[in-house]
Amino acid sequence: LYDALVNESILEFANRAEHIFVGKRKGCYAYQQEQINDLIIQRAYKKGHVVRLKGGDPFVFGRGAEEMEYAAAHGLETAFVPGISSALAVPGHQNIPLTKRGSSESFWVITGTTKEHQLSNDVKLAAKSTATVVILMGMSKHLAFLNLKAKVKAR
């Protein structure tokens, strides 16, 4: 079972495996989360094991914990192999330090949009701090972020 953020060329390394796309993109879901959870259980019982392939780190807004808990509740043994989160990799690739002595003592990683499709309250808190702020899944809210930051600076 693989997500939308997985580079499909990786699937060639498992050419004998059944590949099921369960990806999600804003407003467009191949499967709802409950269906993905059920597929994990069904395929594990039917095939003896299942691989849940996700892009980045499944424990950073990736529902990895939810899926592992669901599998464990159904008696499945799980193993986790962490990926590299874009929250860390992208700033590094652009030579942007997440922390830097004298300017940023911490960093926040925040979802841009909540389950209810609202701006996260944590964004408002982060805008008031001196921390580096990384917002994931936030392109549709980028004007709201900029307006919020401008209001904070004006105070």
Regions found by a protein language model. Give the residues of each.
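Class I S-adenosyl-L-methionine
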Residues: 1-81
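Beta-strand/loop-alpha-helix module characteristic of Rossmann-like adenine-cofactor folds
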Residues: 2-5, 9-13, 18, 50, ...
